[in-house]
Amino acid sequence: MRRVPLVRAAHFNGYLAVLRDLGVPIWGALRRAGLPATTEETPDLYLSLPRMMDFVAASGGARGAMELGFLAGQRATLEGLRPEFQCAILNAPSGFALLQAFLHHRKGEDTAAFSAVYPEGESLRVVCDQPGIEDSDALVCAEWMNLQAVVSIVRIVAGATWTP
């Protein structure tokens, strides 16, 4: 039996805020999608990642998954992470240690997440993948969230204006 990828509801809340700003009636849409209407009040609840991503893609209308993912990624904050993840990031002694903390703790936020860091010349390549939702129209939403997380972590060390 194939395992269902799960993600903490805290990471869904940014998408819900964007959709609400666009005028989407969230509660009814959540109910129709088989997702709990109490998602925003229960950030530690685990949700089906494919169902969540399908909901985002279906609810976004003309905006499209690409824009929704970007907008939700902009709303992501350190406070959305589990306390032990926050602590590991805030106490990391170096940029590489920050990336290692990200790799280690990411599975607690998203059970299907795959992350790795590979040396590439004098640089490092960070890989974030979402096995289990490759066929979803909303994969790009998860990719934006992952990109925002990595950029935010690098900016802790490289400065707020660093861009990939």
Predicted regions, residues:
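N-terminal low-complexity or simple alpha-helical regulatory segments
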Residues: 1-129
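DNA-contacting interfaces and partner/effector-binding or oligomerization modules
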Residues: 114-164
